Amino acid sequence: MSATLNVLRWSALGAGVVYGFVHNRTLYSQAEKKVADAKFKKQEKLIEQAKAEWARLHPAPVASTGVVTDISDDKFDIEAYLNHAFPEKA
C-alpha cells in the first residue's frame, strides 16, 4: 500500500474517533440537562403543593368589619380598604 493511502486511512480513523468523542459528550450533556430540568420541575411542583397546603391550613384573617386587608387576596378591594383605613371625618 502506498503511504498516501495509509495516511488517509489513519486520518479518517482519527477523525472518526474525535467525532465520536465529541458526539458522545454532546449526548451526555443533553441527558444530564434533561435530568436536571426534571429534578427542578419536581421541586417546583413540591413547592407549589406546599404553598397550597400552607394556604389551606392558614387562611388569611378577615377583619371584623368585613374588609380584606391582605393585598394578595383575590377579594381585596382597594377602595374598601382605604375607606376603612382612613375614614372620612365630617
Swiss-Prot record:
GO terms assigned for molecular function: proton transmembrane transporter activity
Pfam families: ATP-synt_E (PF05680)
Subcellular locations according to the entry: Mitochondrion inner membrane
UniProtKB keywords: Acetylation, ATP synthesis, CF(0), Hydrogen ion transport, Ion transport, Membrane, Mitochondrion, Mitochondrion inner membrane, Transmembrane, Transmembrane helix, Transport
Superkingdom of origin: Eukaryota
Membrane spanning stretches: 7-23
Any one GO BP annotation for this protein: proton motive force-driven ATP synthesis
GO CC list: mitochondrial inner membrane; proton-transporting ATP synthase complex
Modified residues (N-acetylserine): S2
Membrane topology summary: Single-pass membrane protein
Function, as annotated: Mitochondrial membrane ATP synthase (F(1)F(0) ATP synthase or Complex V) produces ATP from ADP in the presence of a proton gradient across the membrane which is generated by electron transport complexes of the respiratory chain. F-type ATP synthases consist of two structural domains, F(1) - containing the extramembraneous catalytic core, and F(0) - containing the membrane proton channel, linked together by a central stalk and a peripheral stalk.
Protein family membership: Belongs to the ATPase e subunit family.
Subunit and partners: F-type ATP synthases have 2 components, the catalytic core F(1) and the membrane-embedded component F(0), linked together by a central stalk and a peripheral stalk. The central stalk, also called rotor shaft, is often seen as part of F(1). The peripheral stalk is seen as part of F(0). F(0) contains the membrane channel next to the rotor. F-type ATP synthases form dimers but each monomer functions independently in ATP generation.
Name of the molecule in the record: ATP synthase subunit e, mitochondrial
